[in-house]
Amino acid sequence: MTDMTLLNALSDDQDFAGRHNGPNAAQQNIMLKAISAESVEQLIAQTVPADIRLPEPMKLDPAQSEADMLTSLKAIASKNIINRSYIGQGYYNNLTPNVVLRNVLENPGWYTAYTPYQPEISQGRLESLLNYQQMIMDLTSMELANASLLDEATAAAEAMTLCLRAGKSKSKAFFVSNDLHPQTVDVVRTRAEYIGIEIITGSVEELDNHDVFGALVQYPGTTGSITDLTDIIEKAHAKKTLVAVASDLLALTLLKAPGEMGADVVIGSAQRFGVPMGFGGPHAGFMATKDKHKRTMPGRVIGVSKDARGNQSLRMAMQTREQHIRREKATSNICTAQALLANMAAFYALYHGPEGLRKIGRRVHHLTAILAAGLRNSGIELASDTFFDTITLNTGKKTDDFYKKALAAGINLRKFDVQLGISLDETTKVSDVEELLAIFTGNKLKASMFTADIAADEFAAIPESCRRTSKYLTHPVFNEHHSETQMMRYMKKLENKDYSLTHGMIPLGSCTMKLNAAAEMIPITWPEFGSLHPFAPADQTKGYQELASKLSEMLCSVTGYDAFSLQPNSGAQGEYAGLIAIQRYHQHNGDSHRNVCLIPSSAHGTNPASAAMVSMKVVVVGCDEKGNVDVEDLKVKIEKHRDNLSCIMITYPSTHGVYEEAVREVCDLVHDAGGQVYLDGANMNAQVGLTNPGFIGSDVSHLNLHKTFCIPHGGGGPGMGPIGVKSHLAPFLPGHVQSTSDEGQQYAVSAAELGSASILPISYAYIAMMGEEGLTEATKLAILNANYVMERLRPHYPVLYRGTEGRIAHECIIDIRPLKEASGISEEDVAKRLMDYGFHAPTMSFPVAGTLMIEPTESEDLAELDRFCDAMIAIRQEIARVQEGEWPIDDNPLVHAPHTQADLMETEWNRAYSREIACFPTDHTRASKYWPTVNRVDNVFGDRNLICSCPSIDSYIED
């Protein structure tokens, strides 16, 4: 061994890959023997079609150690300049309570959980999201709120389409106030363009002059002014116009709520409730509406129900509205929400309580009033005499001088043509106000000079008719957790109710619940990334620009694409952006008539829902008995729609968990007919390093960074869905109203140019630490793990789809339908019984009803895979006891699952099976038990008796 060979052998650069990937070499050998493969390479050769295997490795820098990655990323972050930003425009500095920072944002018990589709093991975050909904409902005075949307601008676009669905006007025009945040207007315009809505803009006072189905106004306006909307909304309703109001939660602690003015929908951002600006995200957008619009409201809604014992329980309500069920007829294509950020905002409200929030609001307003008084006294004109936290100054020819003077002092202001905007926030101090006064007046004015006059009429800048008199956050939960001890214990109590990756494997097919490593998460709380305003001057954001550029280059190397947009905030939003790029490409080529989108019957529900959002005609392509796209049916559909064919949306490997042999033929057939190929990146975890969309023949894809590239699921968000394209589509990527680039500025899909920018370091860190070898190894091990699980379960459960050589990709589908026919036990019974064994359920009934889809990922080691397989085999044996008549169909551990501590302590046990079988079916559960906190939740009761707020429901539940 040479000196250099020894040095290389002792290097720690490859250590991270070994820690991320679960099975070590010895475990791999055991697994390979079990599946009758001589090596991992032989398995891959039997699994991935040879004609799509990459001829050479990905071009990525060598892997970095954790320490080296953090050092290099810190150097990038340090290039961001953190000035005092008074830009406002929907983004504000705030103080994240440290108790929330440490116990939620930095806690894998909160950030590694999945969306709470399994309510029995999700009661903690369901309760927190219910608190969030109650907070939004109270502050807006509306009857119903959802559990978050992707951002404020997305919420505005969704409000527009809600008004269209729910309204009775025959108009196809929508009014947008000219005092709305410009980034919101951009996203609304994009949505309107593709569904045939005409946008009319003007002052809010002009609304009555127009025949429109809906209107979007802002309160307070983007320039800070406050208008009483009561009469305006009343006149709109007289003309069958629904009115959506964009508002600010902190302002609503002092201002009359939009609901009290008659608003039909209220939207906004919960960012300033304890969530860092993060250069634009992620943040929880909110939406509240009237109860009568509940069936047409987009997004997830948490509701109250009861469990099998009649005890109160929580669940996601009205799921039949969602895209995975209604597909192209869904109210929205939204899948991921912003659960983690919504929870942070809810905890912020709990920690401060109503009095604490009002105190913060009063302080911000008081400092704004002092600033306004000092400026007025110095002869500077304000554009409006009404304000909460934002004032706009008529600075005329001095605008540039004042702006540059502020920049020289390390201060960012909002610049208009001949005006300057100043927005104060929770972090603003008296000394900050005095510094601002000095910049504009040239004098060292003291705030104390103006406080006495302002205190005498504290709310003079708020019109009397707009001052809040109603109470909010009166529920005990907002009034009991104001000490850090109380808060810490409450958050821990909720966390302990939930199942996350801290407990065990989450084998959800198509969801890729892999490791979210601590080193990847560390940078997101650095102030260099968290404290930057998304509209700060470009010379202050060089760190983010470099991060975005490097990550885009990495993703291009991984995918075979030529350009990336990091703007989309979720996979579904990425689909939407990618389809817009395709349609704009066709329009550019004079092919505006091309609007047919071919979608296999096995596709994710977001695919047809996204296609519907750009007014495409969805044509379904069948699948053959092996789960592949039926090429003959595809040829028929292409020929029928050849002249109008826009694209095909495929997933690879397919949602059936196999690498389709004919994928290149599919791409060629579509291209030959003038169409584009959209490859859904949901299953990219089975491609990285082995093949890629560009090499296969795709034109555009979104990547779920919260799947393949390690951004955690957060209990239901955040997610990110950047889109990659081949060069011919690059000019049609999303842009932004604040963009410094000239490309793609025709439309935007998110409020901020880089979407949820502050979580980009997670994916960057993952790729940097894994390197080419580690990433490729991860893909191979994801395939090995899945095939091992499949082979262990195959003697006990039918496996629905396999490739030509009997292998599967990174996930497999087991068929429960024959067992249900023979025993009466359903896939839901199996899923709930797995909870008693200490596991989260696999994906139920997708893409095939009556099945379970299992994806172990590369991060789980052999011991955990065996624990899961042993549980599934034991459950199959339990089903056999039902089949054989030993246990009645209505009294067995599967139909009563999951079991709780209350079951264990029941005075009389009258069931056909023992308590031990119910609660401690394995040695592992006897040694370390995860307890569901409720029995099986009654979904039907929850939807028939819809309650989406915090107050006790004892009076609603009948015996």
Swiss-Prot record:
Which residues get modified to N6-(pyridoxal phosphate)lysine? 707
The prosthetic group or cofactor this protein requires is: pyridoxal 5'-phosphate
Which keywords annotate this record? Answer: Oxidoreductase, Pyridoxal phosphate
Q: Pull one GO CC term from this UniProt entry.
A: cytosol
Spell out the family assignment given in the record's similarity comment: Belongs to the GcvP family.
- How is the subunit organization of this protein annotated in UniProt? The glycine cleavage system is composed of four proteins: P, T, L and H.
Q: What is this protein called?
A: Glycine dehydrogenase (decarboxylating)
